[in-house]
Structures are given as C-alpha cells and as structure tokens.
Amino acid sequence: MNFIKENSQVLIQRMGMTVIKQILDELFVWNVMNYEEVNVICGEKFEQDAARGVIHMILKKGSEACNLFLKSLEKWNYPLFQELHGLSLFHQMSEEDLDDLAQELKYFYQSPSFLNFYPLGEDIDIMFNLKSTFTEPVLWKKDQHHHRLEQLTLSGLLDTLQSPCIIEGESGKGKSTLLQRIAMLWASGECQALTKFKLVFFLRLSRAQGGLFETLSDQLLDIPDVISKQTFMARLLKLRQRVLFLLDGYNEFKAQNCPEIEALIKENHRFKNMVIVTTTTESLRHIRQFGALIAEVGDMTESSAQALIQEVLRKEFAEDLLLQIQKSRCLRNLMKTPLFVVITCAIQMGKSEFHSHTQTTLFCTFYDLLINKNRHKRKGLAPSEVTQSLDHCGDLALEGVFSRRFDFEPDDLSNVNEDVLLTTGLLCKYTAQRFKPKYKFFHQSFQEYTAGRRLSSLLTSGEPAEVTKGNGHLQKMVSISDITSKYSNLLLYTCGSSAEATRTVLKHLSSVYQHGSLLGLSVTKRPLWRQESMQNMKSTTVQEILKAININSFTECGINLFHESISTSSLSKEFEDFFRGKSLYINSENIPDYLFDFFEDLPNCASALDFVKLDFYGGAVRDISGNQDQEFSGTYIPSRAVSLFFNWKQEFKTLDVTLRDFCKLSKKDIKYLEKIFSSATSLRLHIKRCVGMAGSLSSVLSTCKNIHSLIVEASPLTLEDEQHITSVTNLQTLGVHDLQIQRLPGGLTDNLGNLKNLMKLILDNIQMNEEDALKLAEGLTNLKKMCLLRLTHLSDIGEGMDYIVKSLSAEPCDLKEIQLVSCCLSGNAVKTLAQNLHNLARLSILDLSENHLEKDGKEALQQLIDRLHILEQLTVLMLPWCGDVRVSLARLLEQLERVPQLVKLGLKNWRLTDAEIRILGVFFEKNPLENFQQLDLAGNCVSSDGWLAFMSGFENLKELVFFDFSTKGLLPDASLVRKLSHVLSKLTFLQEVQLVGWQLDDDDVSVLKGAFKLVIA
C-alpha cells in the first residue's frame, strides 16, 4: 500500500486509459472490483481521473487488492513497473541533464533563427529582429466581469504571474512577439522574475502535433533517446512551477491533435506547471473560464510606434513617415496597432525615395495581407463561397456606416460563412460576459475602408443590379454636412480604390447643394471665422456663417478625395465641376504637400474656387530656409507659401489674406507678400494685432494693385498709413477695429470721402471726438455706393452722431445695413433717422442697440417705430432704450406683424414687466417667424410667472440659435426651470443661451444643459 501511495502521482499521469481498462478487466475477474465500480471508472472523461479513481479504490480495499493491482500493472505496463522499482532500462534525468536541457533552450532563444522573424509572414521576405524591434507593450489586467482593472507592464505581469495566464488581443497586436520576448529574457538572465524557472518552452500551437513530448521535440529540442517520454514527463511533473510554457496562438490550435496541451491549459491544477497562452478575442471564450490571470494587449503607444519606425527604416524615410503620421489623425489612430505600423514601414522598404502613401494604399495592403496570410485556414471552401462572404462583409460594413453601427449581432451574419470572416481577421467576435456575441471590425477606420472598397466595386461592377445598388448608397448622401462628417472617410476609401468610382462620386457631389443640419458646427473651433459670442455676429445671420464653414469643409473634403484618388489627371473635368464656386482655407504654418500637387495637377480646379483664405502668423522670425531665428535677417512669411502661390500659373478669383500678431515686417516679407498677392484677381487683406506694422502698412498697400477689401484690427496706424489707406480708391470694404490713438489732421476721417467705390465701412472702438465725427459725416456724403455702415463703440463724440445720421439719410441711397451700436446715439439723431427712413427703403438690418436715449428719447423711438413699415426688407431690428420705453411695445408688435422675414430682434433694457412679456409671448404664438434666429431680452423686469407665461409663444421659434434673458437677481421657480428645459429640448438649432443673473443651483443647471453653450455668469 505504501508503495502505491508513494508513486500515485506518477501512476496517475502515466498509466494511460488502455492500461487502466486492461487492469480493470483483470481485477473484475479476480473479484477485486465489482461491475458498478468498473463502470464508474471507465466513464471518466480524462485518463488521469480514471487512474486516480482506480488507485483510491484499490487503497481502500487493503493490501491484498494492492498486490493484485501491482501484479496486473507488471503484466500490462512492464516499463512503468520497472521504473517505479528503480529498474528502468531508460536513463533517469539528473540535475545535470536538466541543466544541459536548459542551456540548449537558452542557446536557441538567443540564436538568429529565433530572434529573426517575418512580421508579415514567411511569404514576404521582410525580416525584423526581436532584440532591436521589440517595444514595451501596454497590458490591461481584466477582472471577472471582463472589465479592465489596471494597467500592467511586462515586468509587472511576470512579477504577479498566475497560471494559467491568458493574454488576449486582436490580430496584429503583437501577442506572439510578446511571448518570444519572454523566452529571450529568460535566456538572457536579465529578468529577475524569470530566474525562478528551470525550463521555459515557447510553442506555436498552430504546429502542435501528437503529445506534449512530441511537440517539444518537433519545435524546440533534440531529447536524447535514452530519456523516455515517461521519464521526461515525470520530471516536468516534479519540477512543477519551475517550468514555464509559453503557448502561442490558441485561436489556431486544434485540440484534437494534442490533448495533452489542451489538458495543460484546462487542467493546469493537475500539472502544476506555469502556463502563459495567447489567443485572439473571438477564441477567448474557449479558455476564459480556466484563466487565473487574464490580460489584454492594449494599444501601441505613440513613443513605441515611433521607436519601431526609427529602428526599421532609414533615418530620412523614418522622419518623412513620422511627419506624415503627425499630420493625419487617422494614421495616428492606426499606429496603435503594431501590425499596421509594420505594414506602413514595409511598403517603404526597397524604395529609392520616400512615397507618401494614401490611407487607402495602407488599408488595401493590410486587407490583402489578411486574406492571403490566412488562406490556409479556408481549405475545402469553394472560391465562390469565400467571395460571397467577403462581399457580404463589405455590405455589412457599408450598411454600418450609413446607420452609424460599428457593433453587429449574430443575425447580421446569418447569410454568410462566419468562419471565413473570423479566420481572415476581417471581423472580431466578442463573447466574454455577453448573452449574445458581438462582432466588430478591428478598427472603425478599417470598417470604413471595407465599406469604401465595397462601394467602389459596386459602382464599377459589370452587373447592372450592383451598379444600381451602389448608386442607391450615393443617393443617401444628400447634404453637405453629412458628407463632410458621416461619410467623408467612406468616400475617401471609395475614391482611393478606383478612378472610375471617383468619377461617379464627384458627379454626385457636384450636384449636392443642401447644407443639411448645421447643428454641431462650431464657429469657435474654426480658424476661418472670428471667435466671438453668437450675440455679436451682426455682419450676417448665424446660419450664413455656419453655411460658410460647411462649404469650406466641403472643399477640404474634395481636396482629400483628390489626394486619395488613384488617377487625377483623367478626372480633371469632374474635379473642376466640383470645386467651382467653393472656398478654401489654408494655414501658412502647415501647408500640406498635397496642396502643391492639387495646384500643379489640377490648376483649373484651383482657379475655379470663389476665394482662397490664407492666414499668416507672427512670432519667432524664421530665416528664408524656414528655420526660426531671433535675428531680423529672416522673414515671417514662409517661403513655402510663396512657392505655392507665386509658382502657380493661373489666378484665383479672390485671395483673402490675414496677417496676425506681426511685431515687425521686413522688406523681404513685403516682397514675399507682393508675390503672393499677385496670384489673385481680387485681394482681401485683414491685419490683426500687428503692433509692429505701424509705418509699414503703406509699403504693403503699395504692392496691392488688386486690393478691394482692407480690415485693420488692434493694429496701430501712423498718419502716413491712414493717408495711404484713403488713397486706395478701388477699396470696396474698409474696417478699422480697436484703434485707440488720437486722430491727426489729414488722417482717416478727413479723407474717407476719397474712397468713391467704398461699399462697406466698419469703424469699431476707435478714438474719435465730435470734430472727427463731423468730418466723417462730410466724407459719407461722397460715398454713393455704400450699402453697409457699422459704427460701434464710439465714445466722446458729443453730438457727432446727429451729423452722421443726417448725412446718411438725407438722400435716397442703397444702404442695406446700418449698425450704430454704443455710439452716443441721441434722441435727435433717432428723430432724424425716423423722418428720413423713406430714403433708406432698402434697409434690411437696423441695429441701434447699446444706446440709452435721454432727451426726447421716448418720442424719437415712437416716431421710428411708427415708420418701420417703410422697411419692407427688414430682417434685423435691434432698438435702443429710454425711460418708459415699454409703452411702445404694442405699437412695435403691430409693425412687426408685417415683417414675417424677421431674423433678429433686440429689446435690451426695455424694462419689460410680466404684462409686456405676456404680450410678446402671444405675438410669437400668433406670428410664427419661420426664420427667426436671435432674441435679446436682457435687462428686463420679468418674474418667474411672466417668463413661464412667455414660454408658450417662445417655443414656436423653431429656428432659434441664440437668446439672452439675462436679468438681475431672478430666483426662478422650479416650474419655470422645468418648462424652460422642456422648451430648450425642442429648439434643436440652439448654439448659445445667456441667463446671467438667474440664480440657478447645480440641479437647475444640469436640467437646462444641452448641446449649446449655457452662459450663467
């Protein structure tokens, strides 16, 4: 009995099912075991469990039963019997044998045959070295709910290793390389956590055949013939946790080929050896329940991707590629997958010069690699079945893009061979902690590429039904906003896949004129447009500004399609049709290479643009070669911008140039600007915060033979500059902002009358006195073509506004917009305006806000309101205030009943009470203004009850973009907050809401918050 007890572990591991059954038959004949006991043992699924059952039963039956058991064992497995008695004919493994075996493994793990590997498969002769190309992975420890618990380093994983350890990750995440790295670290002795292991075995499960002993012999070791399988396996058993198995690729493992390795993972508690096994996400479900530690391979870090690129590419290629990645958000995201980094590097190898490959090229390479690399997994499948499955995968991706779905259900794959898509790596299957599995493409961008590839094949198919299907998808793209957001990448990859598909796409895009929803377009996030409150956008309606941003995005989308397209010269006409009438924004600090190609390859397309906007920035001076330099021997204007515009053989219709934050301007800068300015028929120049340009503006203007618009903002001017401005007689637009210097005789206001062609004049926050205002009024009488006048934030001009208003309105004119905001407007000036309103019949925008009328203000305002019916084209009305002005509200609303086209209304500081606000609410209820966008009711005296009553009419303003209900010390009732929240949820175009002075707590704010800007302080 003691002998059997002492050797029970070896017996359990090595008897085998055949021997067990033979022994059971004899013990049954000898009446040691009964029928039921034999059936129980034979019914065990695993041979080790059967062996364990036999031994436990025999030990319970006493010494005679034990002797009969050993007698039968000697008969049926003589080598094992002899070995247990120390009489084995085979060599027993000594410590020296183990040391030799370990040394042999270490030699192998440090040899070129192990360290050098083919990252793209052996069919592609591109080789990496594990020592030089390995980068530290990001690992995530998972909890029992399959949630990420904490981040681990490789050393952290090894320090806290539990067995079995399962490492999961999608294809291309570097799982195999990780296990190879562990083997290499063990061999080098550099990792303290691995020194406890006597033996480390790295096995590729895709090549596992036979038993564990046979697989080790086949992949790693030449085990001496004198060491039997039983001896070797028994030794591994005794070493327990001093043996580490690195099992790579459970997703490619055929368990029936090697049940011992399957048991090593799933019955690890019996083997006691340490195991790390890798698998893809979709195969995790087969072994997840057996894992003591589960870790996910996370995204590759930016620094790791950079290190890998610099290691495998020539220095100049690496620099060019890193620059390309830096410029592309899509590429930066894709670089989080190691295999994609490898592909991006691989397609540059063997080239004599760097080629900036398109995203489509990279994805196409990746797609084809997946299909070809895994073709051995599709043996036995008909090519037609594979093609059908791939087409369905493309349709799935395409439908997902249109429905914004990036997760798919089993029903979505009901008509396809799921295994084809999973084994090729096109789809990943997620089952952990899910009642139903979820399917995803490995990356959202890859789904969009697969969709674009499929759409391209549909549009160019020889089958009419498929072409119709493809065109049907194009017809779903009916608005610019959807094309530039939802479908931009889909179109990018469609055009990158086929020139003929590009032709079809461009023809469709050229016919798209609907803007679609402008919700989500932010004027504050685009460099093309001034960053200011929605309330201050008085030059045009908010919708028009958003539409301009939308068109600019549409142009950028078209240029991206040009850059991605396979053939551009053959598509010149289609591109020209698309770009005609559109605008383009260029940042001179970051001019992409493809713009040079665009100008050179499709010059007619660039000249077809309505206007091009170009921004220049001051700061550290750069030398002519482009390097920054603090000495003023260099320039601010990049020579790259000069090359782009001056070398171009055609002309833009309009060039809009902005100079920002220039502290100086050299002669070279001015010469560069002249070259750039010459590339357009018409020039718009905007100078913003250029403190150092005082005295230089005249030199700049002298180079502008074609300037039609000049805006100067927060940039000081000398007398010479002002005089030169008024000498540019072809100016059509002039704007001066934030100029707080004393006006000198003979300057701007004295000579404005020289600008006979001026159509738009804007003077904002400039220092003027009454005498300057008088001279300005005299000059205005000569400006017969004026259609827009904005005078804002002018103080200390005394009665100067009386002269200006009289000059403006004395004779019939073409003025369409007048803004006299915060500019000392008097009651007398308003009376004059009212009396002469018939001379301003074409006026559509009248803004007199931020003015307090003192003497005769009430009477003047009533006169103006009484004559508003003259302005049949009125869209914007912003009124001043005075004492007891609210009594004029009823008459104002009577007049506004005739103005259904009203877009903006301002009654700031009218001191409206609950009674008046109810009247205004009834007006909005009875007169739905379809295009109404902005409402300013700040500074009124309305209670919660008044605002609540106002809501029923207010909610009819469906197109509202901005409103201001600011007041002093209003503590809103809960019912008002709830009602306002309900109304806000209906106003889907809202961009900004101002409730300054409303005493709102955190609960109120959380209820009111939406997709708009909420200003409460």
UniProtKB/Swiss-Prot annotation:
Entry keyword annotation includes Cell inner membrane: no
InterPro entries according to UniProt: CARD (IPR001315), DEATH-like_dom_sf (IPR011029), LRR_dom_sf (IPR032675), NACHT_NTPase (IPR007111), NLRC4 (IPR042220), Nlrc4-like_WHD (IPR053882), NLRC4_HD (IPR040535), P-loop_NTPase (IPR027417)
Modification after translation (UniProt): Phosphorylated at Ser-533 following infection of macrophages with S.typhimurium (Salmonella). Phosphorylation is essential for NLRC4 inflammasome function to promote caspase-1 activation and pyroptosis. PRKCD phosphorylates Ser-533 in vitro.
Record GO biological process: activation of innate immune response; apoptotic process; defense response to bacterium; detection of bacterium; inflammatory response; innate immune response; positive regulation of interleukin-1 beta production; protein homooligomerization
CDD domains, sorted: CARD
Residue numbers spanned by region Nucleotide-binding domain (NBD): 95-298
Occurrences of domain NACHT (ranges): 163-476
Keywords recorded for this protein, A-Z: Apoptosis, ATP-binding, Cytoplasm, Immunity, Inflammatory response, Innate immunity, Leucine-rich repeat, Nucleotide-binding, Phosphoprotein, Repeat
LRR repeats: 578-598, 649-672, 728-751, 755-778, 780-805, 817-840, 841-863, 871-895, 904-926, 929-956, 958-978, 992-1014
Region (Winged-helix domain (WHD)): 356-463
Record SUPFAM superfamilies: DEATH domain, P-loop containing nucleoside triphosphate hydrolases, RNI-like
Protein task: Key component of inflammasomes that indirectly senses specific proteins from pathogenic bacteria and fungi and responds by assembling an inflammasome complex that promotes caspase-1 activation, cytokine production and macrophage pyroptosis. The NLRC4 inflammasome is activated as part of the innate immune response to a range of intracellular bacteria.
Record remark: domains: In an autoinhibited form the C-terminal leucine-rich repeat (LRR) domain is positioned to sterically occlude one side of the NBD domain and consequently sequester NLRC4 in a monomeric state. An ADP-mediated interaction between the NBD and the WHD also contributes to the autoinhibition.
Name of the protein in its database record: NLR family CARD domain-containing protein 4
Taxonomic lineage of the native organism: Eukaryota, Metazoa, Chordata, Craniata, Vertebrata
